[in-house]
Amino acid sequence: MLAISTGLTLMPPIGRRTALKLIAGSVAGSMAWSAAPWVRAATAAPAPDGRAGDAVLSIGFDKRMHTRVWRRGKPLTGWQPSEALLLASGDVTDFALVEQTAHVLDDPRHGAGRQAVFTGRSRAAGVEKQVSVSSFDAQPGLALLQVRYRNLGDVPLEVTGWRSSAYQLDDAPGGFWSFSGATHTDRRDWVQPLAADFDQRNTLAMDSSDYGGGTPVANIWRRDGGLAVGHVEPVPRPLDMPVKRTARGASIAVESPKALTLAPGQELVTERTLLAVHEGDFYAPLQQYQVFMRGEGIEGPRPPDSAFAPIWCAWGYERDFRVEQIYATLPKAKELGFEWAVLDDGWQTNEGDWKIDRRKFPRGDADMRAFTAEVRRHGMRPRLWLAPLAADPGSDVLHDHVDMLLLDKEGAFQTVTWWNALTQCPAYQPTIDFYVELVKKAIGDWGFEGIKLDGQHLNAVAPCHNPAHKHASPEDSVTGLATFWNAIYRAAHDANPEAVVELCPCGTAFAFHNLPATDQFPSSDPLSSWQVRSKGKSIKALIGERSSYAGDHVELSDNRDDFASSVGIGAVISSKFTWPKDTDRPSVPLPPGGFVLTDEREALWRRWVGLYNTHMLPKGEYLGTLYDIGFDKPEAHAIRKDGAQYYTFYAPRWDGKVELRGLPAGRWQVRDLFNETDLGVVDGGAVATLPARFERFLFLQATPAGSAA
């Protein structure tokens, strides 16, 4: 992990706690080579063709230790210097291969597998390179790599970083698409086609003061398949996953930009990185990553049933709401079928103190208890909005507990731009204790049944150099964020085992390492319906059957009414409608027509909430590999539930055939659920097709012919 060591030692399986210790130790240069963090069962004969991997993915090494990737026996890339040490004097890419060894793996978490270790030397640079390639039978097409560089010379080497799994895919008809798990401050799409000038660094470090982190996977794919790269460490690591359109195709890699001095005899050890080959879009490699990390001990909790209930949020009334406005809307929200009522931003005096605003709740705690009681009286569940780790200028906590602040190496603050607030350190125990007590009070005393944790700064933080915190390493804040969320999650569930903890890191690419502390992810301020759907497909791959993904307020979607982009992909529906009228004190001009529930909107809302509650597709099996979200037209999503299969197609306009993929053999009755129209019977087994004409969406259900829907 950009570690420096002086010996070769096989290590036991690495868990989160061990990794934290090693990262702390690496600053002083004491981390050992860990090319074999999985249990070896025996030594094996190396492959005579210089390849490592399995029948789906194999990586070949030539005499210079350049590599080539094969998928199912066919070359996917050319020979390329995929692993390189980056020096101030230039990149070291050529190493004379001197040794190859092989081992059989029998790991208690990942099962049987194999490992090959390739060793080479660069005489010119005075560097030895050792590359470990591990694969497991349960994960065909996925390889885990780790590289060790040793300074064999007599003078220090000024290292500027390293690069692994650097490959170019040649151009092909239709071009390329890419998924990026890294956060960008401009909240760009996670899934994009690669234009001629496409060039993204995809850093997992901070992109700006309050935007950073993400899921450590990126990929590129053509119509015939693609490559994914990333890392499999149990804690966040500040690596880059650059993707670029080139003159000949598209390139991808994993890189570390961290500079260090490598003394004679010392070693640099990289993070454990992944390389995967796949067909179709990004769903398959993300799902492989999710399964692998589950074996490493990182997985989401199984959320309570209430995490799938429709959500009404009072944010339509904004911060300057009146409690009476919320109370007046509850009967309508319940009538339409919404189960949650979210008290959003504005109940508090400021971000930081989290004291009740007595202008809205004059009796303080008593009024908050009365609020939750009123929500329950209408047969709904109350949820409370919070934005932890932010302290507003002028707040008491900023004055009385300035020690909580996260500081950079110059002693400067990290800012949260949305609230013009300052970031608090999640790895400082007084900070943790403060927010744990706040959550316990909100759920255990006030009676809220869920917490909405909101803000882009919640996804990742910068290294903390505050001397008051006595961190073993500045990276403690980075790796400690997931621990902070675990403490919040435990506090909420200790107070109410059925509580729902929602994490909404606005506009960011969700940090996978925060997953164990999250019952529900929304699409987090989507900029379009495309973001609702493409984020949803990503999250369903990363959480799997434990998924509660919400489409966020439908008013953020195209035309401010696109429930189809949530319902059709199995996302929880949400709305911030107002009723019987809009706020008369908006902070910004309302959109045309506002958010008020007109008669026309009410009819549409009622229809979609009814369809959602009737079919409850978030509890179905999302069939993410059936369609390629980039290349298949129209865009399609499929879900299997209770013996039926659901298909939703999306396009501005479509007039042609649609394919119903994945139908088992037999006769299937197809129904247009939104328009309540039977479309006939198709044969399963092969790919069934239907003629279709629609605008925006087509929402279909296929049931065995002769059965009741």
Question: Predicted regions span which residues?
Answer:
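C-terminal beta-strand-rich structural cap/linker in extracellular carbohydrate-active enzymes
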Residues: V682-A709
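Aromatic- and carboxylate-enriched substrate-binding clefts and catalytic-loop regions
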Residues: W340-S548
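Polysaccharide-binding surfaces and accessory modules of carbohydrate-active proteins
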Residues: P46-P242, L673-D678
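An acidic-aromatic substrate-binding cleft motif
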Residues: Q288-K332, L336-W340, D344, Q348
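Beta-strand-rich recognition/accessory modules
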Residues: D49-G53, R121-R123, N202-P301, S566
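Active-site-proximal substrate-binding groove within the catalytic cores of carbohydrate-active enzymes
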Residues: Q266, T270, W485-L679, T689-P691, ...
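N-terminal secretory signal peptides
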Residues: M1-I14, V27-M31, R40
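N-terminal export leaders
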Residues: R16-I23
